[in-house]
Design a protein with these regions (language model features):
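Extracytoplasmic
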Residues: 19-499, 811
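Extracytoplasmic/periplasmic substrate-recognition and gating elements
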Residues: 99, 295, 783-856, 884-891
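Conserved N-terminal structural module of periplasmic/extracytoplasmic solute-binding proteins
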Residues: 386-606, 917-941
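Hinge/lid segment of periplasmic solute-binding proteins
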Residues: 523-541, 602-655, 678, 705, ...
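Extracytoplasmic "Venus flytrap"/periplasmic binding protein-like
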Residues: 565-633, 637, 661-672, 765-768, ...
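Periplasmic solute-binding protein
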Residues: 609-612, 631-672, 689, 696-725, ...
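Glycine-centered hinge/linker elements that transmit conformational signals in sensory
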Residues: 724-754
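Long, aromatic- and glycine/proline-rich binding clefts that accommodate carbohydrate-like moieties
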Residues: 793-797, 846-904, 908, 936-941
Length: 941
């Protein structure tokens, strides 16, 4: 809470306790990542939790600021609500509290934006953020199926489109990362206050904000006193894949073809017969079903479930009945790992009797961390402590210590032995607790035992610490990865059963021989059934196109699902998706080329076009409409001899990432220009820290990233090639100076050529660097221990003579092409038109993130699609600002020789200390001779 809030406590009769704790809370700025909810909660652990509820109407006593488009009005069938249309800005309400105490906060809201994902907000009390997590609040946007599951002309199921669930929803503000299952508690003194919501990704209608305290649920034994089942025997089975609504667009029906008992099932035809799997694993996600009973009374609940994804770990859910948790045991329901389908009875060996009302009732299963909450919190603390120790060690030894030197680490670092012993004990206690909860001793948690053994060795032989610092960093990364795994809570559901008798909760099994017959039919059907030929309902179509993709299986599966579910019903054209790593030149020459190829690297289209292997695209009727979806520069890499031969699919570029905690400790500010960066390099190197300027791929020491050279060149106002595209500008004064600057980073400043930026950034020995902007999502998913301790920013620029900063950055991308041998070029173009539009790119990105997490966040070339992915409003603004300053390198005949010789020149200067000017001029002569030869070969001159 803020200093002003502490003052309010003193002047409104607040207790001495309130004044002391508020003052303590203000020892630091609570909005940064060092002030977590765990510390805030401990500070107010003894505070009262009054049973009164304070209601703040959305339409009253509010002030909109910072550009927020907010006004009182009517929406969604309700009057007197706040309608906040913009994604950014802030809205502040004034309200009175009757007494001191700790309160939870819940909102009754309506998502206004049909295209958006979750709503993201920040909360301030009296103008201050009470703790870091309050700046990253998430309210889910709910969806439901537009129709029931239908069938195509071949009898295969068509998955229904997921559309927004346009109803008012009440949701408490709480953790969405898996560290806590309870709503946040906010301490307030009696008297006047303000509550501010800041829009990270708003677009929300707010009916009311409530400050409340939920009564603790009673135990099941108390809840069920005198409980009896309803009078008449009753059993009804519900298909889990047909819920009322769910908290994510990607919680749609999926399929299982492994069991004859899955309902419904078919050995040959595709049936969307389950819901969940890995899509239903993120903390706070939920699915709501409607069940109906003939009379008031108590009923048993069962479900056919499977948790076969997180090996050796459990998944947890919280059960709500008609909006509330019925009893304490329902707050954390454990589903154990098993490769087989299970008939789960709620309550286990002593089934629960749950009160339902006559008519419709709502059942909700929410993803929680359950018994693992404490384990997750302790793992996070352990990783943080290990990384702090690692950073202290390398500030003494450097990242590459002399293994024959005794650095006396145990004496140089204060309380070294005690700290290491505490970490070792913590590792052991976390491991023991995880195993006691049913997790596998030899599975994922074995990473903890490795860390403990290493730490114990440090105590016994501190002289060996320097030779093991890379191992320490690696083990810390392993624990962080374990934490991510533990937070994932996948579950798949087939059916939900409501019954007055426990015997009817089990699925009627068709036995071993039934399954054998089912699998035999499925095997035989695989030879005759054309699963790729999915038509548009009853409409007959013979139009088919072959689409090759050079991605992983997960990406191809998502693409296939979208093609079958959206493109084919819309156009009547079937797209057969194949994962192919074959050379396109070979395919073209062999006459076996597909119609469309997706995710082609940006260097290939011109290379294929000059050999006659691609179809020029400018002549298609919607070409101008399609290309208007992208940045103006995005087509530059696909222009050859006056025509365009590809359409952008994805595009990425670098942003700057820096550790705010380390910068603060060293009194540094993020660099605006490269001159600022040089100063930062010197300060960091004085502390045995370094900077990450991309050069070599972390998995390939021989690779060199020439994008930094291109970035520096364009920032100076130069271009890669001359205007006639017949030669480079490398031997110009600007080109030579840029080459010299580029090589100086590694030759003179000693920056590392090869490094793992994720590991070194999270450990802190590389607290600043450049990386693709999707590194943001990777940090969010895989490095939760440093959440709030880093920021993303624009890359350093070059200041011109007028004082303006040029932040040009080299972008890279993939594209879609139509092969020259396509038999239906119009159908192929329709597919490219569809896959690059806003809806398709948004859906593809959303589904990939749901499947693989934020570390695999898609980088669409479609500008509008970016706003439909899981970026906050401020993040979108930042990325778009850098995107507008990006450029794509043109491709010319002989492009391959440009990079090859530029890399050779770089190596000769950096590794052999050659003269930069002489070297780049000599290699540039070779480049220009090859360009001239290629132009003659393809009759361009």
């Amino acid at each position: 809470l803020s200093i002003s809030l502490a003052a309010t406590a003193l002047f409104t009769g607040g207790t001495a306790y309130a004044a002391e704790t508020s003052a303590a809370a203000q020892s630091g700025t609570l909005s940064d990542g060092k002030n977590k909810y765990s510390a805030y909660s401990a500070l107010y652990a003894a505070a009262e939790t009054p049973d009164n509820t304070v209601v703040i109407p959305g339409e009253k006593n509010f002030t909109a600021a910072d550009g927020a488009e907010a006004a009182a009005g009517s929406y969604g069938g309700r009057d007197g609500v706040l309608i906040w249309k913009s994604k950014g800005g802030s809205v502040t309400w004034r309200f009175e509290m009757p007494s001191d105490g700790k309160y939870s906060v819940r909102l009754t809201y309506f998502s206004l934006d049909a295209d958006a994902q979750d709503i993201e907000l920040g909360l301030l009390l009296d103008g201050k953020t009470p703790f870091f997590e309050a700046s990253q609040l998430v309210l889910p946007k709910c969806f439901h199926s537009e129709t029931e599951i239908t069938k195509d002309k071949n009898g295969n199921d068509i998955r229904p489109k997921q559309i927004p669930y346009d109803e008012w929803i009440t949701e408490p503000l709480g953790d969405h990362t898996g560290v806590s299952d309870k709503p946040y508690g906010f301490y307030l003194t009696g008297g006047a206050h303000t509550l501010t919501l800041t829009g990270a990704l708003a677009g929300i209608g707010i009916e009311k904000i409530e400050l409340y305290n939920e009564k603790e649920p009673v135990s099941y034994s108390e809840y069920s006193k005198g409980a009896k089942t309803a009078g008449k025997e009753y059993t009804k089975v519900y298909e889990a894949e047909a819920p009322l609504y769910q908290s994510a667009k990607t919680l749609y029906p999926v399929y299982d073809r492994t069991s004859i008992d899955t309902s419904p099932s078919d050995p040959i035809k595709l049936r969307y017969n389950t819901i969940g799997q890995s899509n239903y694993s993120s903390h706070g996600q939920y699915i709501v079903w409607t069940v109906e009973v003939p009379e008031d009374g108590y009923y048993y609940l069962g479900a056919r479930i499977r948790q076969n994804i997180s090996t050796g770990t459990n998944s947890y859910r919280r059960l709500y009945v008609n909006g509330s948790v019925p009893f304490k045991e329902a707050e954390s329901i454990k589903f154990e790992f098993n490769n087989r389908w299970q008939d789960y009875v709620f309550g286990g060996s002593e089934p629960w009797l749950i009160k339902l009302n006559k008519g419709e009732n709502q059942l909700k299963l929410e993803v929680v961390s359950g018994d693992m909450t404490e384990v997750i919190a302790e793992l996070q603390e352990l990783v943080t402590n290990v990384n702090e120790l690692y950073r202290e060690i390398i500030m003494i030894t450097g990242a590459s210590p002399d293994t024959y030197r005794d650095y006396h680490i145990d004496k140089e670092i204060k309380d070294f032995n005690e700290r290491v012993k505490n970490m070792s004990d913590k590792a052991q206690s976390v491991f023991d607790r995880a195993v006691s909860l049913g997790n596998s001793r030899s599975g994922n948690f074995s990473a903890i035992t490795k860390l403990k053994l290493l730490l114990d060795g440090f105590i016994k032989k501190p002289a060996e610490v320097p030779s093991n610092i890379s191992t320490l960093s690696s083990y810390a990364s392993g624990i962080s990865g374990l934490m991510t795994t533990v937070k994932s809570q996948p579950l798949e559901l087939d059916t939900i059963t409501v019954s007055t008798v426990t015997d009817k909760l089990s699925t009627k099994r068709r036995g071993f021989w039934g399954n054998i017959a089912f699998q035999a039919k499925a095997f035989a059907g695989s030879f005759s059934e054309d699963y790729s030929s999915i038509g548009s309902g009853d409409e007959e179509t013979n139009r088919k196109i072959e689409v090759w993709v050079s991605t992983g299986r997960d990406q191809a599966t998502v693409l296939k699902s979208l093609s079958d579910g959206v493109f084919t019903p819309k156009t009547g054209i079937t797209a057969n998706i194949s994962i192919v790593a074959q050379s396109l030149i070979q395919a073209s020459l062999s006459g076996m080329s597909p119609d469309v190829v997706l995710f082609v690297d940006q260097g290939s289209p011109v290379n294929l076009a000059m050999r006659g292997g691609l179809t020029p695209l400018s002549g298609f009727d919607t070409f101008k409409d399609v290309t208007a979806r992208f940045q103006a520069h995005s087509m530059d890499a696909y222009l050859y001899n006056g025509d365009y031969y590809a359409i952008p699919v994805s595009e990425s570029f670098s942003m700057m990432f820096y550790r705010t905690d380390i910068f603060e400790s060293l009194n540094l500010t993020p660099p605006e220009t490269w001159d600022d960066m040089y100063k930062i390099i010197r300060v960091l190197q004085q502390n045995n820290l370094t900077v990450g300027i991309p050069n070599a791929d972390s998995s390939n020491v021989m690779a060199v990233d020439t994008g930094v050279f291109a970035t520096l060149l364009y920032q100076r106002g130069e271009k890669y090639y001359t205007d006639d595209m017949k030669s480079t500008n490398f031997d110009s004064d600007g080109g030579i100076d840029t080459f010299n600057i580029w090589t100086e980073f590694y030759k003179d400043y000693g920056l590392p050529n090869q490094y793992n930026f994720l590991n070194r950034f999270r450990s802190g020995d590389m607290p600043i660097g450049l990386n693709g902007y999707t590194f943001y999502g990777m940090l969010k998913q895989t490095a939760p221990e440093i959440d709030g301790l880093w920021k993303m920013a624009l890359i350093p620029g070059t200041r011109d003579e007028n004082g303006n900063i040029n932040r040009s950055v080299c972008a890279t991308g993939t594209c879609a092409v139509i092969m020259k041998g396509s038999r239906d070029k119009e159908a192929a173009w329709k597919y490219i038109d569809w896959i690059t539009d806003t809806d398709a790119q948004s859906s593809y990105g959303q589904e990939m993130e749901a499947l693989l997490g934020s570390s695999s966040r898609f980088t669409p070339a479609n500008v509008k699609a970016l706003s439909n992915l899981s970026w906050t409003y401020n993040e979108q603004q930042l990325i778009n600002s850098q995107w507008k300053d990006s450029f794509m390198l043109p491709q010319i005949p002989g492009s391959y020789i440009v990079d090859r010789n530029l890399i050779s020149a770089f190596r000769k200067v950096v590794y052999s200390s050659a003269n930069p000017r002489e070297t780049i001029v000599a290699y540039n002569n070779t480049i220009e001779n090859e360009i001239l030869r290629k132009r003659k070969e393809f009759k361009l001159d």
